[in-house]
Amino acid sequence: MSYHRMTLSKFLLEQRKKGVIDPDLGSLINDIESACKYVAAAVSKGKLISQEVNVTINVQGEEQKPLDVIANEIFLKICEQGDQLQGMVSEEMESPYIIPPEHRRGKYLLIYDPLDGSSNLDVNLTVGSIFSVLKAPESGEPLEEKHFLRPGREQLAAGFTLYGPSVMFILTLGNGVHGFTLDREVGIFTLTHPDMRITPSTKEFAINASNERFWEPPVRRYVEECIKGKTGPRGKDFNMRWIASMVAEVYRILIRGGLFMYPRDTKDLSKPGRLRLLYEANPMGFIVEQAGGMISTGRESILDIVPRSLHQRIAVILGSKEEVELLNRYHNDYDSGKQEEFESPLFSTRSLFRNP
């Protein structure tokens, strides 16, 4: 066992010395790290712990899993005590959580999804936590919802923790993306994946193909061309994936490239996008761009969008840059009338597995 590992704490100390972050931001990241360790322990217990919690319907209109509630409480209790925050926003809370007056008024705002992909818990698949850090107002005015409604370009830090066979903590401070693996024996995150980079091209994409009939023509065009493989216009074979866990999809893309799509569709006209802008799309977009990838709605960069509400949903296309750029071009072609209505359903009159 090496005693000279670069731990997350040492890494943050180095970033402080380089002037990348200040001591308060470093301390906040350490608090988030601690929260994620507790969540990892809770997730690993599964039904052993979740039987004890009463569940309700959250602000999204979704039934909370017991571990959703537990993870949210862990983040609240640990992060409010560090004196670095003014407030927090979570997927599991309708309105901002204002730090109680007994704590020092901090310089930062924390936005987080305490347990992304929690629908996978019942089948024991990968879940994770996502977080984003913004600068808090300095004027001394009371903290309000509007202070959280800022474009993703203003993020100071973002990351996610993957609770899989190993626990991974992925972090960007705006100067690249780095991955840390939890050594469970000693309870320390150690740098194992420095300077993670997303390959510009790929042969792999992830999308929920059961929604094909609701997709816009540019997305159907893209997927159809990928499925045609070597015999189609792309001239290469693709693999299709779908885990239903954004943290797992993005981690795979960071490791070996790829494309993740949860595009705009017509399945529910009140929700043209499915993923949440503030605590899913923005932090993941910051990470992906810092790793050399790209994120878009198909029509604009997600990181440039000014949020309208805390729980705003949005279409998301992210991953290898060349593929995102191609999808942007397909959307532009369609919007400008250069692409005719695409009428080649994947799952109706012909098989995916038959040569055209």
Curated annotation (Swiss-Prot):
Main location as per UniProt: cytoplasm
Among the GO biological process terms of this entry, one is: sucrose biosynthetic process
Residues involved in Mg(2+) 1 binding? 91, 113, 115
**Cellular localization per UniProt:** Cytoplasm
Binding of Mg(2+) 2: at which residues? 113, 116, 280
UniProt cofactor(s): Mg(2+)
The region annotated as signal peptide is none
According to its record, what are the GO cellular component terms?
cytosol
Q: Which pathway does this polypeptide act in?
A: Carbohydrate biosynthesis; gluconeogenesis
Q: Name the InterPro entries for this protein.
A: FBPase_C_dom (IPR044015), FBPase_class-1 (IPR000146), FBPase_N (IPR033391), FBPtase (IPR028343), Fructose_bisphosphatase_AS (IPR020548)
Pfam families, alphabetized: FBPase, FBPase_C
Reported EC number(s) for this entry are 3.1.3.11
Highest taxon listed in the record's lineage: Bacteria
Show the catalytic activity: beta-D-fructose 1,6-bisphosphate + H2O = beta-D-fructose 6-phosphate + phosphate
| Keywords, alphabetical | Carbohydrate metabolism, Cytoplasm, Hydrolase, Magnesium, Metal-binding
Q: How is the cofactor bound?
A: Binds 2 magnesium ions per subunit.
Residues annotated as binding substrate: 116-119, 208
Q: Which GO terms describe its molecular function?
A: fructose 1,6-bisphosphate 1-phosphatase activity; magnesium ion binding
Concerning its family, UniProt says: Belongs to the FBPase class 1 family.
Xref: NCBIfam families = PRK09293.1-3, PRK09293.1-4
Kindly give the HAMAP family that the UniProt entry links to this protein: FBPase_class1
Q: Quaternary state and partners of this protein?
A: Homotetramer.
What name does the UniProt record give this protein? Fructose-1,6-bisphosphatase class 1
